Amino acid sequence: MNAPIDLVRSQLDAGGLLAEAVSRTGGLTAFGDGPYREALDVMCASLIDEAGLSERGAAMMREKLVGQLVNRLVVEDYFRRHPEIADIAIDDPLVIVGLPRTGTTLLQRLLAVDPRFHTAAWWETRYPAPLAGETLAEPAVRIARAQAEVATMIDCIPQILTIHPLDAMLADEEFMLMEHSFVCAMDSYANVPRYTAWLAWQDLTPVYTYLKRMLQFLQWQKARRGVAPATRWLLKTPQHLHALDVLCRVFPRAQVVLTHRDPAQTIPSMASMAHTLWQMYADDPDPLAVGAQWNAGMARAIGAAMAARDALPAGRFLDVRFEDTVSNPLGVAEAVYAFAGMPLDARRRTAMADWMARNGRDKRAAHDYSIARFGFTDAQLARDFAAYRARHLRAAG
């Protein structure tokens, strides 16, 4: 049942969210740079008018947005008190990019076995800023909260593990860091077509400059916890498909591993995952709306990625087939290391083999869904993604 509109409006008033964040931080007022306020205004209006939030969903969304605003305030306060954070050089991440369900998580976590990579665990992306009652050296409160949230999500939506292997302590996507810009894919969580249309026209440079700022802050915290310095960051999120050109401009020595799989095997599964997330915030989200929006969004993302690929030096990219990642993950890892110019010795290869023995895809249940439920047909998917299939699936061989 949808929450009363007046309740949603009071919960998600943008000015009220900002004021609450200031109050929770004891009067901090510097939210940092970027168009976060305009983005927040558009996002909140769309959530209020279009998302059909339940009472629980509206309350959860309020906490999500206030928490992100609080993080912005705390992050800026740390940069003010420790200006050396801004001097941390992060310009050469190894970035795994592809549609969801193309083996990106498996590949990221396999490579993350190597301590030469800095990665962001789920708890770090969910709670990037210290909370009351903990120290930089011992982030126990954040870890406990993140573990409790993951456990709650699994209890409420057990099928989520068939879609994405959630674990608060393992490497995950930096998407939750990017969300702090408020220029992000809110349609991952709710039906916000007006916001999504606005987002399609935005310059995403501020998203990536803020992502770099967040990574600098996380790396600085890792040093405070005694984590050994790494060679480079390992990043991964499908959202980078929309902005490979911006990514490579903000991180000028980034190298990109592009993962490939037939969109007919990925887009419907992704719509199913999005529908699962929408159910956390709305009682009866329309699966057809989910399917239409994600099909259109991923078609735009793939088109943008193909255009960026044409404009950027070919040597910045490595193509990897999903089938190879599943059937020969260590062979794919070796190819990635060669591409990255990093040696892979026997000790590290053995560590990866041990990790695969414990965490292969065969350890997870299959994701069961109907493509028709989300309005897809095989013919439509073949038509909408014909250019990608003709070009990149063959090129990845």
Language-model features, listed with the residues they occupy:
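PAPS-dependent sulfotransferases, especially Golgi type II membrane carbohydrate sulfotransferases
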Residues: 1-77, 85, 191-208, 215, ...
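Phosphate-binding P-loop
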Residues: 85-91
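Glycine-rich phosphate-binding P-loop
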Residues: 96-113
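Short His-Asn-centered micro-motif
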Residues: 97-99, 234-238, 322
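Post-Walker A helix-loop "phosphate-sensing" segment adjacent to the P-loop in P-loop NTPases
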Residues: 113-123
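PAPS-dependent sulfation machinery
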Residues: 126-233
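Flexible, glycine/threonine-enriched loop-and-boundary segments that flank and lead into catalytic domains
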Residues: 229-253
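Conserved phosphate-donor/acceptor-positioning beta-strand/loop module used by diverse small-molecule
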Residues: 247-272
